[in-house]
Amino acid sequence: IQSTNPTVLQHHLIHNTSPLEMPSVRQLWLIFVIGTLVSSVFMAPILVTSVNAVTLLLFFIVALPAWIIGFSTPVFAWWSTSNEYFGLSTTRKQGEWMLVAGMLSTLPALLINSLISPIIINLLGLSVTDEYSLGFGMILFLSAPIGEEISKALAVLCLARFIDSSKRGFQIGFSVGLGFALLENMTYILNSLLIGEGAAISFVFTAVLRAVGSIPGHATWTAISGYAIGKYVVNRRSNNLTEKSYTDTKSSSDSQWILFDNKSGLPIISSKTRKLPNLPSWLSAGQQKMVRITGNPVIAVAIAIIFHAIWNGSLWSISVLMKDSSIIVQLLTNMTMIFLLILILWIILRRLIPFALLTD
């Protein structure tokens, strides 16, 4: 820099505090619905007609976009739901950390489910190769819930610096669960596309059922753990730090800003403004029907494990009981159980959200 006058150059580094901005919930669900329907239409010729160059070309054209839409858009739709309705100011940096932490938590869970648990079960004399065997079932209703819920809870704990309330812990747990579901969903959607001639049907069923079932399930179970971890972190922080040091820490990590009206000069909104959650009826059953969430992290993680175990164990038990039945009976029974589990999940979620967000 050249100047005729003495010049002092100062470079200020500030944290990026831009808010998390996402497409609306309606837009994301619309993309998901249209994308899955169009993809299934393009894959239908393989199911209806014989495999030939034209049907294979149609399949390969739509396979990659179908996979991306199928595994990602429902996760981001639920993420947008939490960002839009939970009433918590979230920066883009915080949102990215939450999702990435959930994705990283799949690594220890995968290690437990794929390596450690099979070795232990084999040492007990049980087989894990037969899907109807007790050993295989133990992977589903014991190993997976324990390994996955503990891994996700530890991911929430790693984000303790973002936690300023139990409500924030609930939000972080919800987002971490979505990050975990994102990577898990990649595998399930890919498998549904590689099934062969029935890909058009398996893709739609897998994408839709996971969008309204497994994805919010992971988010809900981890949100329970996150709420308790949030309460624990806040209580421990207030007990261990003096009021001054806590204030200094908070002021150094939070940006202070005020937005003024350019005409009147009056303040419109500031960093201290707290938005009240505006919960729609489909997401909240109201404060009259809310269910309390424990503030003990150990109990909360145990509850998450139990819910997860019931989900996996119910589906596995039905498949074992119906293994000698016809394909039609097996399909109807499994679908009935899935719809029942989804209904129970939604009843629980709609009663947990008002407690976590409206009573903190």
Annotated model-derived regions:
Residues I1-D360:
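Hydrophobic alpha-helical segments at protein termini of multi-pass membrane proteins
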